[in-house]
């Protein structure tokens, strides 16, 4: 049985656009890239270089944000587990009101 080859493409996540600093950095970067393209002797090469560098930057940013989100979820899960254990160890209905 032949296995189909699967191509995985990275898609730009719109989550970083929720941060004003990121949007302003993108705007400044685009303006600089536009200026460089206008002055370049070989705009196609400059464009592909800028595109690959920008893609790498966005991939790294996306990876960092996902890592931070996973860390927050892990801490919240641990906190919830501790609260759940304390709830089960408490005796009586009056003690359960605290939780």
UniProtKB/Swiss-Prot annotation:
It is found in: Secreted; Host nucleus; Host cytoplasm. Keywords: Host cytoplasm, Host nucleus, Secreted, Signal, Virulence. A motif (RxLR-dEER) lies at residues 35-55. The keyword Zinc does not apply. The keyword Cell membrane does not apply. GO terms for cellular component: extracellular region; host cell cytoplasm; host cell nucleus. Secreted effector that completely suppresses the host cell death induced by cell death-inducing proteins. The RxLR-dEER motif acts to carry the protein into the host cell cytoplasm through binding to cell surface phosphatidylinositol-3-phosphate. Belongs to the RxLR effector family. This is Secreted RxLR effector protein 94.
